[in-house]
Amino acid sequence: MRVDRPRAVVSDPAMPHDPVRHLVAEVERLGTRALPYAELHREITDRLRQVLRIDAACWHGLDPDNRLPTTANPVELLANGFLTPQTEMAAARSVLASEYQRPDVNTFAALAGRRLPSAILSETTRGRPERSARYNDFLAPVGPPHEMRTVMVTLERAWGCVVFHRTAASGDFTTESSWPRPAWPNCSAATSPPTRP
């Protein structure tokens, strides 16, 4: 049975980058395939990598009523050696503490309330990522110090998010390098519940 999903706003015709238009179309197409979440996330990340350098992606599910995490998929962090089974729980505790127990920047709840629910850690901290507790006890020690977060919002409800990481060797995310941001609404619509396996 097919359930219609909320339709995202297609990118503005004046958008200067043809690759973004192509990316939006690809994400919309993926959204019609009813793929399991893990496979869909991998497919979207693979397409984003065609226009954006990403060393690791970590997708999360959020409860739209309270914005608490319901799932995490750190498979790329583990596969690329940034996390191990022994350090995964400590990293998860650090991320959760920054979301709900201590002040930090670019929390999922804060991003969900923005017009564009996406932010780069170094931009928010004005070039001083050490202002972030999450950076000090997770990102810097683990090895992918550069972070860009995006919350998936559909019909004003935040139900998921993705964190993109870069190593020091890859360089930081910048406004210029993150120009696929206009595709985020389409990512939200393509991956939104309720019929995803």
What residue ranges belong to the model's regions?
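Actinobacteria-biased recognition of intrinsically disordered, low-complexity terminal regions
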Residues: M1-V20
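Regulatory input/activation interfaces that engage signals or partners
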Residues: D12, P16-D18, A25-G171, E176, ...
